[in-house]
Amino acid sequence: MSDYMMNDDSQDNPHADISQEDVWTVISAYFQEKGLVRQQLDSFDEFIQNTMQEIIDESPPITLRPESQHHPGQAVVSNNVSTFSVKFGQIYLSKPTAEIDGVSQQVTPNQARIRNLTYSAPLFVDITKTVMTGSKSKGDERRTDEVLKRIFIGKVPIMLRSQYCMLNEADDRDLTTMGECSFDQGGYFIINGSEKVLIAQEKMNNNHVYVFKKSPPSKYSYVAEIRSCQETGSRPTSTMYLKMLHNTNKGPVGIKATVPYIKQDVPVIIVFRALGFVADKDILEHICYDFKDAQMMDLMRPSLEESFVIQSQEVALDYLGKRGSTMGTREQRIKFAREVLQKEMLPHVSVAEFYETKKAFYFGYITHRLLLASLERRPLDDRDHFANKRLDLAGPLLGTLFRQLFKKLTKDVRLYLQRCIDKDKEFIASSAVKSKTITSGLKYSLATGNWGSSKSGGTKSGVAQVLNRLTFASTLSHLRRLNTPIGREGKLAKPRQLHNTHWGIVCPSETPEGQACGLVKNLAMMSYISVGSASQPILEFLEEWTTENLEEISDLSSIFSATKIFVNGMWVGIHHQPDKLLSTLRLLRRCGDVSVEVSVVRDIREKELRLYTDPGRCCRPLFVVQDNKVQIKKQHINKLINNDEYKWQDLLSEGIVEYIDAEEEETVLIAMTPEDLVPMPNEQIVHTYTHCEIHPSMILGICCSIIPFPDHNQSPRNTYQAAMGKQAMGVYITNYQLRMDTMAHVLFYPQKPLVTTRSMEYLHFRELPAGQNVCVAIACYSGYNQEDSVILNQSAIDRGLFRSMFYRAYKDEQKKQTSLMEEVFEKPERDTCAGMRHGSYEKIDDDGLVAPGVRVAGDDIIIGKTTPLPPSDDDLGPKTRRHTKRDSSTALRSSETGIVDQVILTTSGEGFKFCKVRVRSMRVPQIGDKFSSRHGQKGTCGMAYRQEDLPFTVEGIVPDIIVNPHAIPSRMTIGQLIECLLGKVSASTGDEGDATPFTDVTVEAISQALHKIGYQMTGHEVMYNGHTGRRMDAQIFIGPTYYQRLKHMVDDKIHSRSRGPVQILTRQPVEGRSRDGGLRFGEMERDCMISHGAAQFLKERLFDQSDSYRVHICDICGLIAIANLKKNSFECRRCKNKTQISQIRMPYAAKLLFQELMSMSIAPRMFTQT
């Protein structure tokens, strides 16, 4: 009874449990605060606010002394020797600007797009110049500092909607005045007017020990590897390997290590001795921890025996130095070895002096891990586990690039300073700093997508891509893409497979088909990528909480029983009460004293506690559960709804939700829904859950969240729809009239779907839809919908069904060839202009531009432009004198027609005149156009019947589309059938149907609802044949389904040719529709003709219609002879033959081949049969 009462007033009770509806309130709060491209923006802001300053602070000051002029390398010996040094200090970034008529002005993103500018902000830096005079020994040392304020060092492209973008704080009205769309999420750059995205790059985790088993062909059985890199500063990673060899017939072999800059593999024990641990006992204490462990001690024996010879640190260092790159005296070698051990080996542990203890402990730990794996006590690592992956977003990517460019800049400053000192000139900061280095370096990489400076070799391509603007969903999806930089050729299946740990982080369905399958992924809806925070606070906290530091451990055997503590892969100490430490850390994270994105992983089996604060980890939010109760209650929901101040951030800081990354996820138990937390009355086992999913449908990404009932479809169908949803036409952005995109498709009358999912709200799919609700019947009706084609209703098309507008923009610029010759926009005249096209010049005005509203057809000139010819020499005769200019106009594409929509004439960044012309054409659906439902069921239009020829129901309803029933059974897209049923209910009741996956909507419930309205339960209806008016035998499944028109239209693909342009080299027809090329009769077609025995046809295709050519050959030697047909004289000079010459026909390509063979002294002799 009391239970019943509790449920009754759950609305008023603030401590009541939450309902399914409340969960969506929380999700809405998340997206309101985060948006959909937060990961891009946060990462970029981190780069601007912290990384750039760090990089500049890290770079050492430039210090120089004057060199003697005649003995380079020797310092001038005199009393008043000055030492100059230059140090870069604080940086400043101003608002985005651009040069307009030589004046720097603020620029809005839309201006940048239209005028092909780069949306970037100038970067300034303070430079401190120090001059030291006199000498220390005499005590008259003087030092003068001079601070040069705000020296311009380059421009940094700004990500739209980031902290430094002018759209950051703007509200909807401001955005409209700036010509921006309020739905646009930002997260991309504008480089030379085109929008560029940085695709997140996946990589292996640094500073983490991996142990892998090697297969027989390799000579090692187990390999432990670690990619080590310092926390601050992206110095390149140094990788270290420890290798365990297979036991040979001579007995067991020792463990070898690969040390950076040392050419051979070195025995492990020698490395320990070089670190200063000489006695065997000391070394084994660092590796085995427990001397009672006989098996492990046995494994170490061969290693100790093999390094028995070397018994002191000096000898060990010399052993390493000998195998290094520098050969010198013994002292130099030892110094080299010490340097390598300090700076290059495991740099993440320490690069400071007195590094030995820490490094020995860590090195021992790596060895320990290798031994554990070879004893099969600890499982091997999984390369594809998502905890072992990190994502490089815009921040780290720009960071590495900026570091390389800044290095280059300092090098230039150094050279300039040296010149100043040698010539005793004044040091002028503005001329010392080449601002172009950083500006053009960043611009080049973002424009081409080639990442990394050209010479260092580490270039990746395809990192920056042009933002896809076909549909709004395709734009969003492109901003949330992940790329794995593995060669696409490798047929490796493992990295491509869906891994358990992808749950909730990567969309399971959205990935391309073909060679990039599984390597290009997309983020799930609520996935969050850590920005990274400093590890210092955590280290200080551990220090307070009785962590034993590695240097302080008195009894080394206690390591075996204690828990090791790692922070970002660095072993910082051991602890004897890990459970207390763990709960304290979690508590601190939940109340916000430690950053929310820190992950705390306790590995109980391996006695390790790993803490991570690094950037690029994938996390996702979950509800916190304590004592099997969700911490979020009705009161929090009410606050979210009613209180504008209460946001997602407050839920985090109150410890109601928390971010869990892929590694910590392995140590928690997650309930699927809050209902799962209520224990069944008769269940034996009660699970102790620690967290609860917010909503299972959040495992999907952008494109799959548009699919209704994806949990009722066969999985590849969802993948196909994810790819096709990106090609659907809709309104791709609301300011499309103000933009000049190269290509754009806009549907005339987009509709929001009758059957929606809850996630669509956050994708703005209701405001910017890409499709229409059409009435679909599943029937055969004539044979015009076989093999995935569909029958359309011509009358509906005439009323505007699926009509769309296609825009294409053409651009041109008056470039300067030289100082004298400048191109001009004008109407070219035939008598003064050389090289004019065959298109019509009538449409353009005298200023060289076509007026808006003019109808243009293929090959018409729309931008007239002339280039002056260089004044020619007199001896070329009078013929060339007439022409003073050359025509370099832009013509409309030959296969298109349309109406000029908009013409913009402006100046480009360099101050030249520059224009863009946009042409629009209406596209009416016709036979051959492609359509698809939201379930991967694509089809082309096979026939369009008028309304009176189509079947109709009792109510007089005529379908708009008829789909063939054969498309359903083998593809198992049951989701489409349920959508049709639910659509029928929605259309009748006027409510939106909810098709969110993993909810409790059942087909039975929908059928019942349909039955109530008065339709047949399964959605079938009696229909009448449109041709005869008779009742059809079968009942037909009919109802509204959401269909998309895809961008593949027959008008853009139709192509034929009789005669046309040929290639110069082979004289065969060129390839491609845009060049009016031929249709290739390929090898397979040739083989078919051979098997048919159609010899004459074969000759016609491959010879007469392709590149027939007439050659004269000498009958004596069989080589090509000289023929002059005008004079009717023939001769072969080799044979002194003028009479015995034959004329033959052969393909021009064969003639070319023969001549190339002749150039290589091979004589292909041809003899005719007389």
Curated annotation (Swiss-Prot):
- What's its catalytic activity? RNA(n) + a ribonucleoside 5'-triphosphate = RNA(n+1) + diphosphate
| Protein task | DNA-dependent RNA polymerase catalyzes the transcription of DNA into RNA using the four ribonucleoside triphosphates as substrates. Second largest component of RNA polymerase II which synthesizes mRNA precursors and many functional non-coding RNAs. Proposed to contribute to the polymerase catalytic activity and forms the polymerase active center together with the largest subunit. Pol II is the central component of the basal RNA polymerase II transcription machinery. It is composed of mobile elements that move relative to each other.
Q: Key word Electron transport present in the record?
A: no
The subunit field of the Swiss-Prot or TrEMBL record says:
Component of the RNA polymerase II (Pol II) complex.
Question: Where exactly are the zinc fingers annotated as C4-type?
Answer: 1114-1135
**Name of the protein this chain belongs to:** DNA-directed RNA polymerase II subunit rpb2
Q: Which SUPFAM superfamilies match?
A: beta and beta-prime subunits of DNA dependent RNA-polymerase
Which family does this protein fall into?
A: Belongs to the RNA polymerase beta chain family.
Residues at which Zn(2+) binds = C1114, C1117, C1132, C1135
A GO molecular-function annotation: DNA binding
Q: Which residues bind Mg(2+)?
A: D788
Q: Where is this region: Disordered?
A: 864-893
Q: Which Pfam families match?
A: RNA_pol_Rpb2_1 (PF04563), RNA_pol_Rpb2_2 (PF04561), RNA_pol_Rpb2_3 (PF04565), RNA_pol_Rpb2_4 (PF04566), RNA_pol_Rpb2_5 (PF04567), RNA_pol_Rpb2_6 (PF00562), RNA_pol_Rpb2_7 (PF04560)
NCBIfam families linked to this entry: PRK09606.1
Tell me the name of the encoding gene: polr2b
In which compartments does the protein localize?
Nucleus
Recorded GO CC terms: mitochondrion; RNA polymerase II, core complex
Q: Which PROSITE patterns match?
A: RNA_POL_BETA (PS01166)
What EC number(s) would the UniProt record show? Answer: 2.7.7.6
